[in-house]
Amino acid sequence: LDVLHNESCIYAADEPIEFKLRIKTKVPNIGDMSFRILVWQADETPIEIAFTKTFANINEIGEYDVEVAINKHNLAPGLYKLTIILSGGTSNANSENLDYVYPAFVFEILHADGTARTWPRQWGWVQLRDVDVKLIEE
């Protein structure tokens, strides 16, 4: 796994998390492939999961490079781990777990402005950043 554009693995709350993986297949005819990406709190509590769309149909033995971008993670400031699970199978059936990496990497989320203000754990782990509020005039 190669982390792209951020070797320190410290991200602002509004910054995408991007990485590249190399997949090596040892058997032919795997078929459709997708990822499940699981985000864990530093204490091993699962926080978020993403199910990707099928990104390839693999029928040949070989090596394949894949880029992944988590554009809006909504994570609150803190320390996290990422698990990447590679799944195979047709898109209209249950997929089979082919392989996984845990932890794929450890990363930290800071406030969007880069400051290190306190984020009390009782506030939660997911940050809702797209909320509109307006005053209702009488």
Residues of each region from the PLM?
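Localized sequence-composition bias
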Residues: L1-E138
